[in-house]
UniProtKB/Swiss-Prot annotation:
Protein name, UniProt field: Tyrosine-protein phosphatase non-receptor type substrate 1
Function: Immunoglobulin-like cell surface receptor for CD47. Acts as a docking protein and induces translocation of PTPN6, PTPN11 and other binding partners from the cytosol to the plasma membrane. Supports adhesion of cerebellar neurons, neurite outgrowth and glial cell attachment. May play a key role in intracellular signaling during synaptogenesis and in synaptic function. Involved in the negative regulation of receptor tyrosine kinase-coupled cellular responses induced by cell adhesion, growth factors or insulin.
Keywords: Disulfide bond, Glycoprotein, Immunoglobulin domain, Membrane, Phosphoprotein, Repeat, SH3-binding, Signal, Transmembrane, Transmembrane helix
GO molecular function, one term: protein phosphorylated amino acid binding
UniProt GO cellular component terms: plasma membrane
Source organism superkingdom: Eukaryota
Classification lineage: Eukaryota, Metazoa, Chordata, Craniata, Vertebrata
Positions in the Cytoplasmic compartment: 395-511
Key word ATP-binding present: no
Organism: Mus musculus (Mouse)
Disordered as annotated region, ranges: 444-513
Ig-like V-type domain segment(s): 32-137
Motif (SH2-binding): 440-443, 464-467, 481-484, 505-508
Amino acid sequence: MEPAGPAPGRLGPLLLCLLLSASCFCTGATGKELKVTQPEKSVSVAAGDSTVLNCTLTSLLPVGPIRWYRGVGPSRLLIYSFAGEYVPRIRNVSDTTKRNNMDFSIRISNVTPADAGIYYCVKFQKGSSEPDTEIQSGGGTEVYVLAKPSPPEVSGPADRGIPDQKVNFTCKSHGFSPRNITLKWFKDGQELHPLETTVNPSGKNVSYNISSTVRVVLNSMDVNSKVICEVAHITLDRSPLRGIANLSNFIRVSPTVKVTQQSPTSMNQVNLTCRAERFYPEDLQLIWLENGNVSRNDTPKNLTKNTDGTYNYTSLFLVNSSAHREDVVFTCQVKHDQQPAITRNHTVLGFAHSSDQGSMQTFPDNNATHNWNVFIGVGVACALLVVLLMAALYLLRIKQKKAKGSTSSTRLHEPEKNAREITQVQSLIQDTNDINDITYADLNLPKEKKPAPRAPEPNNHTEYASIETGKVPRPEDTLTYADLDMVHLSRAQPAPKPEPSFSEYASVQVQRK
């Protein structure tokens, strides 16, 4: 006997209970309506740091995965899914394996400018035979990567410029984010106005580059000057970056060359000096040429540095005047920083000319008029000395003539006075008791016919005269001799008179027998 089945009247209530039970189970499982929430609209992070992108759900149904994307549309990039795969630098914040976990936030480490963009948290429904279907997406979180700009690099012209030349300098920096940035130029503390400044790209990008150009007018005092490019950005905390260009690497100051003569060390030697002043850089070569032929080659090593950064160099060249019979042209040739040579010439008179003039003279081909001023001054001084010497000699001559006129003893100018002179001499001889008495007489002899000129003879003469005196009371005759010693003849200078008179002095020694 078969068991009896449920009565048909009881089947309806049973099905109703099953449907109610299923409805209650579904309501408890889903809880709330599905909603994907990304609380932050944007976050900023410095390059190299970490950031967290938050995402929460209100329900896990329908069943399906949750994924993170950067960007929207077909070109969006999958960043992370919670399927257990390994993704460098990205991790989930919560443990998604726990029952009823609703937190699907992620952490990005070591952020780079390439990580900038808008990130979306997306809920999918798993399909049985078809691909998963996107159900809902969060509002998106934009990540701003604060990337510091690279240190500015300043570049200048390839070749050195000269004073008063205009040269351009360029400053570049890259890899910064966000796009806003400030760039300024300075020279020796004074701000310069740039010719052009550009930031690329013009639209949105993960990082940006900046380039700026400025024009500088060089001058000879710029050897120690600097051109500075200053970059300010939000990531630098009010400490701008600077790029520096030393103008000493971009300027050339040519030397001023002078050739001068120093005081001679002897009558046959002259020092020539070649000075190269205020030049930069220190690359210098100096060559001495003699009549166009190389005489000496200098490679300076010990240069004198000026306070403005330029250099000086002095080269000495000793000239032996006795070795040159003709005029010689000496050339100082200066080659600086592989530029055309600068030459200065200096002409030196030969030994034949200099011996006639008493000293060696030089004539610089460059403007050396100060040497002539020295010569003129010396000449005037010498002329004054000559005039003074002539005046002194003239006064001395007059005094000598007056002295001769005052010391002259008795002068006899007429021939008939000779007899009286003889009588006076005889009287003097008779009155003399000492045989060695010396008598001085001024004999002005009568003028006779002018003798022919003859060669000068010594002034000291010794003459002997025999003088016979008159009879004396004694029986024997007395013979007296006179020794005329040290006769000095003094002739006067020619005068307007026809013939000048002259006087003779004699020393008479009388010997009595």
